[in-house]
Amino acid sequence: MYAVIRTGGKQYRVAPESILKVEKLEAEAGSTITFTDVLMVGGEGTLTVGAPLVAGATVTATVVAQDRLPKVIIFKKRRRQNSRRKNGHRQPVTVLRINAINAA
């Protein structure tokens, strides 16, 4: 069984026991999160597509860790101006383990 959920402005295809990195959620490691924005549920020859959400469907996940992605370097240079700027950014993410998909 699999589902498509929406969180952090993005859509993710999830399956039970899969590990997923999503945009930072305010939750501590070890806590359980329930996603109600389920866009699609499928598996074993059946497919339910929501319009826009599947009514009553939920996905539960456990927070594994709060992490950060590798650094992205931003470098801006203006030629012949002796002007340059270097900056770095590490995006915070939440690592989740999908526990169960409940289709209504």
UniProtKB/Swiss-Prot annotation:
One Gene Ontology biological process: translation
A GO molecular-function descriptor: structural constituent of ribosome
GO CC terms of this entry: cytoplasm; ribonucleoprotein complex; ribosome
Record keywords: Ribonucleoprotein, Ribosomal protein, RNA-binding, rRNA-binding
Transmembrane segments: none
InterPro entries: bL21-like, bL21-like_sf, Ribosomal_bL21
Family indicated by similarity: Belongs to the bacterial ribosomal protein bL21 family.
PANTHER family in the record: 50S RIBOSOMAL PROTEIN L21 (PTHR21349), LARGE RIBOSOMAL SUBUNIT PROTEIN BL21M (PTHR21349:SF0)
Function: This protein binds to 23S rRNA in the presence of protein L20.
Record note on quaternary structure: Part of the 50S ribosomal subunit. Contacts protein L20.
Name the UniProt record assigns to this protein: Large ribosomal subunit protein bL21
Organism, scientific name: Gluconobacter oxydans (strain 621H) (Gluconobacter suboxydans)
